[in-house]
């Protein structure tokens, strides 16, 4: 079936513009599209690939999709097994990056892709080449492609270190306008009823877009980006307080691409504005609880400030310019194929400080107190070591060594080491024929994350609201750190006769803030149900990611009162958590004068430390969780 025409997409003007600008100038660094399900993200990317094939006049140019389960050797390439086994030759087999050369590399749900693969993709997109040093191979080849990633923020954030590497970002959502939604339905149903007729109806519009892409690609290097425009871009990025210089370069390249797309040869303010709206939103976000996007009023103010000429420096004492000094020449416009590059290698003269924007009001704070936490540090390297900043032996990381078949740390076949062993045994004897003794397995290292599950007593036996305020603050604080890594946090509450999954495992602070804003309290204490729900969640998440280590934080007084034999069932449920290998922390919420010590008994059954209710400040709880990690 032919792809849905790009020109037939209803609305999403900013999304379409971002994709077109990336097609005009791939050096921008690609685009990240964030949005809820069913917002034409994938449809737009496939339509762009079809346009690019026409614009470049290449039948080989097209769309290459990178599946989430792809391995590093499939992405960058590896040993050509067929030629090695048949001819005994040491040959390279290209990967997906080589196939994407000249076209579009599309990664759906890029936030769920392994971090080291995202690093490889972004490096290749920025450099335009792939360097392979693995399996005894040293190889380099061109890989110039338009990198497009899509993601649903509800499924977790992309680490800021990786987010900054994408040139442009666009947030999309379905229109709430009834007429627009009706038009979307009509066009989609017409396409599904007769794809060929529908594509033919928009063929002329798509052909015009392809022609504009080709024309812009041919002229973008000739677009003039003058000194005044460069100063305006630099002042704009400084005003928004972005880190590093990547934002300045991306805005400059995008502004030039936008000017070429409009068919003009000089970058103007409207080009800089369009570029800033696409290149700055994800770079100015400093906190996981900040809103996405960029404030138009702030952008207008920044552009206005950037347009003001700096005040001239006062003449030095003793007079002005001497008679024999040449008169200063006005700034001249010059072509630049690398916008934002310095004009000289010498020391820059002192310049007035860039104006800062007035602070915009922050959105209302999430429930409870949010605070900064220390990063999780786990000493040593070994199986199960948690934390995305901690190296750990696992079955899905990068290959770091080879081992004998009997090594328990090895996972899967290490192809090159196996062939090397066979070659050493039968050197010069023709085609390789590995024997069982030649087989080597791969030792992999990756970065593992935690799954922190808060199991909270929301019954009416004591101050449930105070407990939830503390757990809300601790959860959001852990998510602040999870924003830097890929830790996940979940919250289970139990009251009356059941347990409720209040917050599904997430690393999205936005989702957590909304879900933790409301909760119900009161009723009996079904402790066993809460522990059983935590175990069920751990089992379910292990199917998705076996490397993620579960940590359970139980906030209760231990006074189970719901159901038959509540204390006995609680002990059985605790034993089930231990059997799943979950580490735990118990927060003793008992406040009565006569203490029964039931929470301490539960802690002994879980093999967990105990934190007193009097110590239940959110930052203390966070440090307790990190202590058992």
Curated annotation (Swiss-Prot):
Compositional bias of kind Polar residues: 322-334
Annotated keywords: Acetylation
Domain VWFA per the UniProt entry, residue ranges: 451-587
One MF annotation (Gene Ontology) recorded for this entry: ATP hydrolysis activity
Family: Belongs to the Mg-chelatase subunits D/I family.
UniProt-listed PANTHER family: CHELATASE-RELATED, MG-PROTOPORPHYRIN IX CHELATASE
Protein name (Swiss-Prot/TrEMBL): Uncharacterized protein Rv2850c
Provenance organism: Mycobacterium tuberculosis (strain ATCC 25618 / H37Rv)
